[in-house]
Design a protein with these regions (language model features):
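Short, glycine/charged-enriched secondary-structure capping and boundary segments
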Residues: 96, 122-124, 143-146
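Short strand-connecting beta-turns/loops that link adjacent beta-strands
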Residues: 49-50, 75, 94, 122-123
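Short glycine/proline-enriched turns and hinge-like loops at secondary-structure junctions
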Residues: 53-55, 73, 101, 120-122
Length: 165
């Protein structure tokens, strides 16, 4: 009988024991994933590790006062959640725009947007959780000459006009 009343799913031979929920311990993340100079990525969820079909998830660490090279992630959408530290994001064809995010903040990066992550702290590692809209990591490193002074951009919530900025 269908679990949700609408779709029937074949019960796997193990009754979901090993093919259902997966818990990936933080000390078993895979650093053998696409990298960008200036940061360390580690995969938790992808096709090879858990059979994910539509997402990739992992962690990103950027050392104090360090920055990544400019890059984009092809057709993928990315969500970055700041666990600790302060992120300064630059984006655009010449990295001409800038915004900052801190613990508890989310960052959305649309497909093909050239961007750069910067640890805005000189003494704290920037630690983030990263989720992408495909099961494999796609990173296209770019050779961009950034503008000297990027333009600050504040986000305006299109739904809750008096809410977040």
């Amino acid at each position: 009988m269908p679990h949700d009343g609408h779709h029937s799913h074949d019960l796997p031979p193990d009754g979901w024991k090993h093919s259902g929920v997966r818990v990936i311990p933080g000390n078993s993340l895979d650093t053998n994933t696409a990298q960008t100079p200036g940061m360390n990525r580690a995969a938790a969820i992808n096709a090879a590790r858990v059979g994910a079909q539509k997402i990739w998830a992992g962690t990103v660490h950027i050392h104090p006062d360090a920055k990544t090279g400019a890059h984009h992630h092809g057709a993928l959408e990315s969500v970055i959640y700041i666990v600790s530290g302060r992120a300064r994001m630059r984006w655009g064809e010449k990295l001409e725009f800038v915004a900052e995010a801190g613990p508890g903040d989310f960052i959305f990066v649309p497909p093909y947007v050239p961007h750069q992550e910067i640890n805005a702290s000189t003494d704290e590692t920037l630690q983030c959780v990263l989720v992408r809209s495909d099961n494999e990591a796609v990173v296209v490193n770019l050779d961009i000459e950034p503008v000297e002074k990027p333009e600050p951009v504040l986000w305006i919530d299109p739904i809750h006009k008096n809410g977040g900025v």
